[in-house]
Amino acid sequence: EIMPSLVGSEMCIRDRPYSVDALFSAINKGRMVQFRYKKVGRPETRTISPWQMVWENGCYYLIAYQDEKSPAGIRHYRVDKMAGVLVLDAPRRGKAQFAGFDLPSYLKKHFNMYGGPEHSVTLRCTADLEPAMRERFGTSPILIPEGETHFHFTVPICVSDQFYGWVCGFGGKVEITAPAAVRSGLQEMT
């Protein structure tokens, strides 16, 4: 249920499939938003603090701080799954959490924008995959050679089925070596 006492203004967008303008307005004004999030079978009302928007995989995503559910923290929401976006009078929260926020790093660890528990994952790859790994993870990870045939590196990953699918897509040329729980998660899927 939307709380009328928090509502500052409702942005009505014509000729746009999503409430992008309302969200940009809230970001620029430093205000919280409330919306219905369309989850399969159970839409939920959310009240969050928007900070950034990104276009990824053909969709807009709102990067926001949420503290209405535990654990509080930075989350992302697909904008096309939002309905009834309201810009509230309440000032947004999460300034400390976004002070050092690095959007490119956030995007690299979320495969296809799916969330999951974050782990430091060590990947062992065949040498021919160096360009593909650099394209995905950038120049930050240190690639440690293992002779002339392989290398390994460690990166933060939000582990999800999409991450496991990405690993499998290399046809055995990428191996998860650590941590054991993430490695066994892939073995359970295959």
Residue ranges and their predicted role:
Residues 103-190:
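Polybasic (Lys/Arg-rich)
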Residues 1-8, 12-13:
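Single conserved hydrophobic/aromatic residue that forms the stacking wall/gate
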Residues 6, 72, 146-148:
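Short, solvent-exposed coil/turn segments
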Residues 6, 47, 76, 154, ...:
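Short aromatic/basic micro-patch
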Residues 10, 14-122:
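Core beta-strand-centered patch of the WYL/Sm-like small regulatory domain
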